[in-house]
Regions:
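Non-catalytic accessory regions of SAM-dependent methyltransferases
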Residues: 1-47
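Conserved hydrophobic residues forming the short capping helix/wall of the S-adenosyl-L-methionine
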Residues: 15, 110, 159, 234, ...
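Conserved AdoMet
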Residues: 32-109
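Active-site beta-alpha loop architecture of Rossmann-like, nucleotide-cofactor-dependent enzymes
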Residues: 73, 196-199, 251
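Conserved SAM/SAH cofactor-binding pocket of Class I
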Residues: 100-203, 229
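Helix-to-beta-strand junctions that scaffold the AdoMet/dcAdoMet cofactor pocket
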Residues: 164, 212, 238-240
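Mobile active-site "lid"/loop adjacent to the S-adenosyl-L-methionine
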Residues: 195-225
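Conserved Class I SAM-dependent methyltransferase catalytic core
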Residues: 221-284
């Protein structure tokens, strides 16, 4: 008879042999989800014997799904971002560590601005960026904006889950159109837009290509379609000396910088992610 720890170890081994990079983390998540226990509870009952065969069956089923390419975040329905539990499903992209760079820079810039501040999170998806900002900047008001009503439903779930409904709202908008007047003006606009060149989508890992929403990936022929549209249509919502920050793909930072300069931005900065890749571009507008 297996203990919970035995189940974790066997799950980890299966994932490792299958080439899953984060096999340790994912094994813990799988056993936690399959058993209905928190990770903390699993630590306290690691030597307890499993008497419920349903848990073993659940683990086997989850492993099959994972080895077929389904992301673990979609299987368990949640991922952690900037210390916040973020609900996810196939309507939204899974929060990435790379996106924490965009969030960190926005938070650092907001700390130097007089309160209260207003932030617009365009192409919000799960809302992870705007929610992390709201959780870390007291008095900050955040609007999560996305064209997808399914994504906005996830945003609202995450607002409730993280008790941020008082200072965060979610709104359906199309970044290809002029912004609605009711939005007002903002200190900062953050955006992690679709930026994969269309011809590259078929080359993506199966866990991304076959599961994550195409509309959150497809950046047009050159991957820069949304950067052009947003700087053209949405810059007018920034206050004097307001700031726009974009996450971008590998090799895109210089092009995004040029697009922002053409739109009238100055003091443009490029920030690297933890792998040394140019990942975030920010600029000020007067």
């Amino acid at each position: 008879m297996k203990t919970y720890n035995d189940l974790y170890l066997s799950t980890r081994k299966t994932l490792r042999l299958a080439g899953v990079v984060s096999h340790d983390l994912e094994a813990r998540l799988i056993v936690s989800y399959a058993s209905g226990k928190t990770r903390e509870e699993l630590l306290t009952c690691s030597r307890v014997f499993l008497t419920n065969s349903k848990i073993l069956n659940n683990v086997d089923e989850i492993i099959k799904r994972r080895l077929n390419g389904e992301p673990i975040a979609y299987i368990v329905g949640e991922w952690e971002f900037f210390g916040l539990p973020i609900a996810v499903n196939e309507s939204v992209m899974i929060p990435r560590t790379d996106t924490e760079i965009l969030t960190e820079q926005a938070i650092n810039l907001l700390k130097n601005r007089p309160t209260p501040t207003r932030v617009l999170d365009l192409c919000a998806g799960s809302g992870c960026i705007g929610l992390a900002i709201a959780a870390n900047i007291p008095g900050c008001r955040v609007v999560l904006a996305d064209i997808s009503e399914r994504a906005l439903s996830i945003c609202r779930t995450n607002m409730l889950r993280n008790r941020l409904t008082r200072n965060v709202t979610a709104l359906e908008v199309d970044v290809m159109e002029n912004p609605p007047a009711l939005l007002g003006i903002f200190d900062i606009i953050v955006c992690n837009p679709p930026y994969i060149p269309r011809s590259d989508i078929s080359l993506l890992d199966v866990s991304v290509r076959d599961y994550e929403p195409l509309e959150a990936l497809d950046g047009g022929p050159d991957g820069l379609y949304f950067f052009r549209a947003i700087t053209s249509n949405w810059t007018c919502l920034l206050k004097d000396n307001g700031i726009m920050l974009f996450e971008c793909g590998i090799g895109q930072a210089k092009d995004v910088k040029d697009i922002m300069e053409e739109a009238g931005f100055n003091n443009i900065s490029i920030y690297h992610d933890r792998q040394g890749i140019e990942r975030v571009v920010s600029g000020h507008i007067k």
